[in-house]
C-alpha cells in the first residue's frame, strides 16, 4: 500500500473531511458509547471510574480530531497522544495540544495532549498505555497482526485496544465497477488475529447505506473525505461516463433514482492478555 499517496490524499481533504465524513463521525460517537458501555458491564465500572481507568491514551489515525475531542471530553485522561500518518493533521488538532484547550481533570491535573506524525505501523507506543484506540483507520494497515502485537507490548496488563474499521462490504459498489479498492478483513479474521494477545470483550458490525443524487456526487464525496488514497488511475471522460452509466444501472433505487454507497463499520473492544 502506498502510504505516501494515502497521506497526500488525506492532506488535500483535511478542510472538507469534517463536513463530508458523516459516517466516520457517527462511527466515532458510537465507538465511545460502546467502549464505555462494555467497560461498565464487563468491569462493573461507574462512568467516573472509567475515566480513572484510562489515564494514558494513544489514538492512532486521529485525522481531523473528531474522535479525539470525544475522547478528551468523555474520558479526561492525564495524557493523550495523537498520531496520524498525515503531518498536516497537526493543523486540525493543534488547539487540543494547548493546555488551555485540553483542560484539567477534576483533581486539577492538567491534561497533556501531544501530536506524533508518522506511520503507526512503525511506532512503538509508550509502555504503560491504558488505552490504544482509533476510528476508521486500521483498514489502511499492511500488517494488522504485527500491529496488534506492538499494542500488546505497549498496553498495561489489563489495557484496552478499542477500534473501528471497515468490513468486506465497504464501498463494494466502487470495487465492483472499477475493480479497485482496499482489501477489507472480515470481523472473524480480525478476532482471530487479535486472539493470541487479547480477549475480545465486544465485536459487532453494521451496514450503513448513503444515498447520492448522482454517481458524480459519490466520487466528489470520496475525494473530499480522502478515501481515494489507493486509486492512481486518471478519470478520462470516457471512463467517467462508463462508470456513471453502470453505477446508475446497478445501484440506483426507485422511485428517486438516487444511487447508493455502502459503508460497513466494524467495532472491536479487546482486553490485553498478560
From Swiss-Prot:
Coiled coil stretches, renumbered: none
Pathway the protein acts in: Cofactor biosynthesis; biotin biosynthesis
SUPFAM superfamilies: S-adenosyl-L-methionine-dependent methyltransferases
Keyword Signal belongs to the record: no
Keywords: Biotin biosynthesis, Methyltransferase, S-adenosyl-L-methionine, Transferase
Annotated GO MF terms: carboxyl-O-methyltransferase activity; malonyl-CoA methyltransferase activity; S-adenosylmethionine-dependent methyltransferase activity
Stored HAMAP family: BioC
Function: Converts the free carboxyl group of a malonyl-thioester to its methyl ester by transfer of a methyl group from S-adenosyl-L-methionine (SAM). It allows to synthesize pimeloyl-ACP via the fatty acid synthetic pathway.
Record protein name field: Malonyl-[acyl-carrier protein] O-methyltransferase
Reaction catalyzed: malonyl-[ACP] + S-adenosyl-L-methionine = malonyl-[ACP] methyl ester + S-adenosyl-L-homocysteine
Record's keyword annotation contains S-adenosyl-L-methionine: yes
Source species of the chain: Bacteroides helcogenes (strain ATCC 35417 / DSM 20613 / JCM 6297 / CCUG 15421 / P 36-108)
GO biological process: biotin biosynthetic process; methylation
Entry-linked InterPro entries: BioC, Malonyl-ACP_OMT, Methyltransf_11, SAM-dependent_MTases_sf
EC code(s) of this entry: 2.1.1.197
Annotated family: Belongs to the methyltransferase superfamily.
